[in-house]
Amino acid sequence: MAKQTPLYDQHVACGARMVDFHGWMMPLHYGSQIDEHHFVRQDAGMFDVSHMTIVDLHGNRTREFLRYLLANDVAKLTQPGKALYTGMLNESGGVIDDLIVYFLSEDYFRLVVNSATRDKDLAWISQHAEPYQVEVTVRDDLALIAVQGPQAQQKVATLLTTEQQQAIAGMKPFFGIQTGDLFIATTGYTGEAGYEIALPKQQVVAFWQQLLAAGVKPAGLGARDTLRLEAGMNLYGQEMDEKTSPLAANMGWTVAWQPEDRQFIGRAALERQRMKGTEQLVGLIMTEKGVLRNELPVYFFDAAGNQHVGVITSGSFSPTLGFSIALARVPTGIGEHAVVQIRNREMPVRVTKPGFVRAGKAIVL
């Protein structure tokens, strides 16, 4: 039977259509996915992301452990609260998961990992933590709400104490701080400003209701997906998985090659892939009528006149732009134009970098 977050009854009360999402009953939408999408882009929306897993790591060798476990390098994290985005790879260079890691103190780091990969992530982390004597604590006592949009931070501030407001004042992106019972982080999955807030489960219903009263609109998985697609953000299981290299998933920037003597899981395989070359993740725009969908083939000719085929990993109508967009994995050599096969029609598409909207503004037109 699917699990419920502590906010399940609140979703039902708000008129949500609930669906099974990787073993969790989650809101798909609360009536209009499009309206929820626009509200996040233009004002402030909130998402229940309590199905995600928060993992605390304690021990004197935690930093050393994470420098081995993760493709990005936590040596970059020198200021308490600073976070980074990274892949956690297997020995063949495939992506076990993508996650955020926070440096809280020299013997205390926090990971936030995906719900769909929870069991395998925890097994992998625990297995590799043991030689480093790192204590792995799953924080199932916490709930998680993402509040996103241009008015998100302002509306959240109205619910905080003076001390909490001062604690987060001027906090840059990709930081997290514990203030009172709230862990407030300037992270998100929408391309908008906002916070992801972890708090004790027994307090989350009251906090949700306070956010509602402050004019923050609930948004479901549907809007979350179109928002992250517009922002060019990957979804695990679509843009990458255990058989996909981060180099083929627009995650090359998250691989810390320096220093050269840092050994991390998957490094040797990635170095071979880097030498040989991999496929690449690109953006697609289709202004003609129709919708780009996952798994549709993408055809193009390279400079030598040879035809190649790729595949759409995520595609949808873009509510912000008013036409269809997609992320696609394609062989190298693609130019600015390609064709997508939709039923019996070959539809022309424009090839862009993977990212279409940031801070409410189009970045591809």
Swiss-Prot record:
Keywords on record: Aminotransferase, Transferase
Keyword DNA repair annotated: no
Biological process, per Gene Ontology: glycine decarboxylation via glycine cleavage system
Segments traversing the membrane: none
Lineage top rank: taxon: Bacteria
EC number: 2.1.2.10
GO molecular function terms noted in the UniProt entry: aminomethyltransferase activity; transaminase activity
Database matches in Pfam families: GCV_T, GCV_T_C
Catalysed transformations (reactions): N(6)-[(R)-S(8)-aminomethyldihydrolipoyl]-L-lysyl-[protein] + (6S)-5,6,7,8-tetrahydrofolate = N(6)-[(R)-dihydrolipoyl]-L-lysyl-[protein] + (6R)-5,10-methylene-5,6,7,8-tetrahydrofolate + NH4(+)
InterPro entries per record: GCS_T, GCS_T_bac, GCST_C, GCV_T_N, GcvT/YgfZ/DmdA, GcvT/YgfZ_C, TrmE/GcvT_dom1
Cellular component GO terms, alphabetical: cytosol; glycine cleavage complex
Role summary: The glycine cleavage system catalyzes the degradation of glycine.
Family under the similarity heading: Belongs to the GcvT family.
NCBIfam families from the UniProt entry: gcvT (TIGR00528), PRK00389.1 (NF001567)
Subunit structure: The glycine cleavage system is composed of four proteins: P, T, L and H.
This protein's name: Aminomethyltransferase
